[in-house]
């Protein structure tokens, strides 16, 4: 009975936490080189693991206490981290959306242009493989965004990303991006999640981030890091609540 009551209290707390919060991206930054991840949003709560500096995380911030955020990291770690241990790309320049259509979004400022392209999702079952009765692999790559089912006509998949910087142009190809699926329409028929990228740059270091299927069972984060014209990181992970 006691365990049951604890579960009810924790579940109620988490629902309230999500309802009064917002999500953002950042990276771990601590003078000790790592940060403690806690079971609950309290400095007295049990430490469950650690995250090293520069690990990219998504952060759901509690607007009421504004002291902790619920992090999801690319290495699978989920838990609470004290907010001042996360750098939300301070010192980086953020570029904003300037053009949008269902299958193309453009972000730019005076120094850089990032074009993100999508296309109608391929649904040919011959290109997919299952694991434990769920579709898990597309063209032999683990894919994201459909919660184990085949994508239908309501889905798009990333096609390519072009980065233009002064006289330089580089492309993140379809082969590197085709495993990322998302709904073609936004909430109430509005803009889809091509319009929701967070893009930051500092010198020749560019981060391209998004949360696809945000709020749904198939929600996942994607982080692309382009450094000196080359993709040095391409990570995606399921959002765990």
Functional labels for PLM-detected ranges:
Residues 178-222, 227:
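Acidic, glycine-rich flexible loop segments
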Residues 225-241:
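Short, low-complexity, Pro/Ser/Thr/Gly-rich segments in the mature regions of secreted, periplasmic
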Residues 1-9:
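Bacterial N-terminal signal peptides that target proteins for export
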Residues 83-149:
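Surface-exposed beta-loop interaction hotspot
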Residues 24-27, 50-84:
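SH3/SH3-like beta-barrel superfamily modules
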Residues 41-46:
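Short alpha-helix capping/helix-loop boundary micro-motifs
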Residues 8-16:
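Bacterial N-terminal signal peptides
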Residues 17-23:
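Sec/Tat signal peptide C-region and signal peptidase I cleavage site
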């Amino acid at each position: 009975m006691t365990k049951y009551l604890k579960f009810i209290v924790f579940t109620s707390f988490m629902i309230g936490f999500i309802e009064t919060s917002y999500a953002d991206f950042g990276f771990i930054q601590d003078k000790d080189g790592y940060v403690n991840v806690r079971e609950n949003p309290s400095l007295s709560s049990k430490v469950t693991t650690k995250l090293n500096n520069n690990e990219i995380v998504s952060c759901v911030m509690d607007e009421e206490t504004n002291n902790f955020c619920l992090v999801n990291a690319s290495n699978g770690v989920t838990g609470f981290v004290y907010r001042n241990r996360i750098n939300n790309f301070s010192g980086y320049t953020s570029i904003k959306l300037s053009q949008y259509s269902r299958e193309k979004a453009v972000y730019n400022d005076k120094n850089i242009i990032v074009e993100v392209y999508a296309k109608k999702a391929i649904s040919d079952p011959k290109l997919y493989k299952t694991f434990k009765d769920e579709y898990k692999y597309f063209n032999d790559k683990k894919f994201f965004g459909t919660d184990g089912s085949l994508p239908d006509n309501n889905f798009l998949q990333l096609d390519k990303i072009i980065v233009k910087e002064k006289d330089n142009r580089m492309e993140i190809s379809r082969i590197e991006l085709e495993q990322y699926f998302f709904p073609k329409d936004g909430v109430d028929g509005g803009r889809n999640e091509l319009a929701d990228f967070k893009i930051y740059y500092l010198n020749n270091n560019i981060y391209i981030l998004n949360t696809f299927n945000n709020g749904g069972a198939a929600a996942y984060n994607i982080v692309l890091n382009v450094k000196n014209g080359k993709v040095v990181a391409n990570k995606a992970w399921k959002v765990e609540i």
